[in-house]
């Protein structure tokens, strides 16, 4: 199987250690591709809207964005790891996710995403882990992903992995290993189920695209939906 990992920071600290524990289950039989932000990611989105109005390849950071997207689309499992920075994901992670706005449901979602599975790993000192995960989960859901597992930890102690008590480390390792085992035994030849929330988003946007298409048949997003057959009876999860 193929796994693509997006690391919200280049630092090899607590979040990195947690991510490594999770990946241990997959090392022997998986092809793992990792990106460390910000060095492997795009710069800040400038809001030029070229990806929305015309083509994503017109983005100033298209080379890096398309490289990451290729890995995401080819992967069976997506892993996102981010510490909490002031109750949110890292700026580098947010910058990367912004560049995939054109893949949100109201625009041009990739049909491959509807069957994907994802794991989000976050950690914080006391609070902010869940809101950090939500920053990432919002994008994944609007990309069309339904199976999203959030694993979040409150350290309530040291922020240096080497200084965390062994008992706490063991607890963290046990939880991450348990989640990893569940995802390791999945038959990835079968796409994940698409839940009601994602389907609802799809049908609401479908009505919007149908309306926009009547006004302007050359509208970029409508043409994409129409070419995929989604305005008709074709569905990306079937």
Can you say where each PLM-predicted feature lies in the sequence?
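A short secondary-structure junction signal
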Residues: 91, 129-134, 162-163
